[in-house]
Amino acid sequence: MDWISSLLLATVRLAIPVLLISLAELYGQRAGMVNIGLEGLASIGALVGFLTCYITGSNWLGLLCGALAGLLVNMIYAFSTVTLCADHTVYGMALNIFAPALASFIYRVYFGTGSDLKQITTMSSVAIPGLKDIPVLGPLLFDQSPMVYLTFLLVLFTAIFFGKTRAGLSYKAVGEHPQAAATLGIPVVGVKYLACVICGALSSIGGAYLTTCYSSTYTDGIVAGRGFIALAAVIFGRWNAGGILLACLFFGFCDALQIRLQVSGIAIPYQFFQMIPYVATVVVLSLIGTKQAGPKANGKPYRREQR
C-alpha cells in the first residue's frame, strides 16, 4: 500500500510541469499559434527560476522571474510568426535548439564547470487541515506544494473560460477563423500576441517548477522532453482542459512508474525503464493522432488584407 501511495503521490507531482506546459500550448493553439518550442521555453524557465531562487532564496520569485524570462524569449517567436508571418514550425524548432543551449551556457558562466552540484530549498508543502487526514486521497490532493493547488485551479479557470465565457468564445474564434473574427471586431493580432504571452509564461513556469518545487537542482536536460510530451497531451486531451488534465496525469503516472522501477532492484538496464513515458507518448499519438483535428487556423499566418 505504501508503494502504491508513493507512486500516486509522485504521479501528481510529476504531472504538474507537463500540465502547465500543456495549458500553455492550449492557450496558444486556441488562438491559432502552434508553438513547438515548449521544450526550449521550459528550459529557460528552469534555469532562470533556479538562479533566482539560488540568489534570493525565494521560490516564488524564482517562478516569477522564470515566467518573465520565458515571456520575453517567446516574444521573438510572436513577432516572427504574427507580425512577419513566418513559419511556426521553423521558429519553434529553432527555439528548442537555442534555448537549452543558452540555459546551459548561462549556468556554466555563473557557476563555472566544477563538478559540485548546486542546490536550493524547494517550496514546502501546505497541508489543508482536516482534508489531509483522509486515507490515500488526503496526502495525494491536500498535502502538496501551493503550485499544485494553483495549477489545478488554473485547469478549472481554463475550462470555464473557454467553455462558458464570451471572451473565451471570441478567443477560440481567432484560432478557428481569424478573418471572420476580425469582421466581428475581435482584435486578432492582439489575441495572438496575448496567446504568445500566456504560452511563454506558463511553459516557463512549468520548467521553473522542476527546479524550485521538485528537484532542488538544475542539470542540463532537466526538462527531459516534457515539452514534446505536452504537445501530445494537448492532442490526447482533445484541446480541452479536462481532457488535458487526464492526459497529463497519465503521463505523470508513466514517469513516476519508471522512477520506481529503476530502484526496484529488477535486473533490467535502467534505460529501458526511462523509455516508458516516451514510448507511452508514441503509442498514444499512434492511436489517436490521426483522428483528432485542432483549431482550423492552427499554424496559418493571418494577414489583414485577406479579410
Language model feature labels by segment:
Residues L8-T11, G40, W60-L68, V90, ...:
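Hydrophobic alpha-helical transmembrane segments
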Residues Y214-Y278:
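Transmembrane alpha-helical segments in multi-pass inner-membrane proteins
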